[in-house]
Amino acid sequence: LSHIGGDWRGMLMEDIFQKSGMNRDFVIKVPDRFTNAYCKPMRKGISELEYEDPRLDFDNYEPISKETEDKVIENLRKISGNIDVLCVADQFRFGIITKRVRDEIIALAKSGFTVIADSRYNIGKYTDCILKPNEVECWRAVYNNEGYIDAGYDEFIDAAQLLAKKNRSTVFCTLAQRGS
C-alpha cells in the first residue's frame, strides 16, 4: 500500500512492479506528486575504493489531497482482512501517513491486529503497535529534545522502556553501532 507520483521514479517503480508480477491494486498513482525517494549514491573510481556520496532526497513539500488520503484509508481497510501483519514505513513528512491514516492504523492495532511502525518523525504518536525507532527517534519521542547527543547506552535503554510504557507498545530500538 503506497503511492507513486507521475515522475520518472514512479514510472521506474511501475515497470519494476509489473516485471516482478507484484500486485499493484493498492499502489495509488497521483500524477501531480513526486515519488518520494532517498538515494545514497556510491562512488567508485579506477581504484577499488568505494564510498558513499551525500544522499539525494526527492520529497514532496505539501500534504496529500483529501481524495488520496481517503483512498489510502479505503485501501488500508481492504488489505487488513488479507494480511497477518502491517508494517508501516512512515519516513516522509509529506508521505501517505497523515494523522487520519495514522489514526486508522492505530485503530487496527487496538483491535488486536499486529502493526509494526517505523517512523522518522512520528514514532511517539503510534500507540498499541510494535515500534522500531532508532536511538534518536526514540529519545525525541520521550524527551522531545536534542539531549541524545550526550546520552549513553543506559539512557537509551531507559528511553525505550519509557516509550514502551507511554505508548502501550513493544519497542525495538536500534542503537547504530551498539546494536538493538
Protein language model regions, located:
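Ribokinase/PfkB-type carbohydrate-kinase core domain
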Residues: 1-180
